[in-house]
């Protein structure tokens, strides 16, 4: 079953979004990092204090862009050296200011909770988790 996007990166007004989420994986992370429009969206979101979230291998992109300098962060095991300037925690999910990083797919619920906590509120995130009957 094909998935159809309702909007493409060419049609996004970055002033209208709360931030960006980089899903990671391989070769997904390499494809994201090779796309200049994705990198522009990440940099713009960071500069404007919007949410910048990355999971699995994708935090490496933030490291390469210098976004993690002085920030606590985590990533999929084996990508730690790519988190340039970061204080690597090794925990499942880390929120440092507007930056959220997570280790991998097994941390997706926690990662989503962190995103909703910043985008809406911790109470809203807790309600979503409660309604899903997890964590």
What is each stretch, according to the model?
Residues 1-3:
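Charged, often glycine-rich, active-site loop that binds/positions anionic groups
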């Amino acid at each position: 079953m094909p998935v159809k996007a309702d909007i493409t990166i060419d049609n996004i007004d970055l002033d209208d979004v709360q931030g960006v989420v980089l899903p990671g994986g391989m070769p997904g992370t390499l494809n994201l990092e090779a796309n200049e429009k994705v990198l522009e969206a990440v940099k713009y979101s960071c500069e404007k204090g919007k949410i910048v979230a990355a999971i699995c291998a994708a935090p490496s992109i933030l490291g390469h862009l210098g976004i993690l300098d002085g920030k606590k962060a985590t990533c999929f095991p084996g990508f730690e050296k790519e988190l340039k300037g970061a204080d690597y925690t090794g925990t499942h999910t880390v929120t440092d200011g507007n930056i959220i990083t997570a280790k991998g797919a097994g941390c997706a619920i926690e990662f989503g909770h962190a995103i909703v906590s910043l985008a809406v509120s911790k109470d809203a995130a807790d309600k979503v988790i409660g309604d899903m009957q997890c964590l």
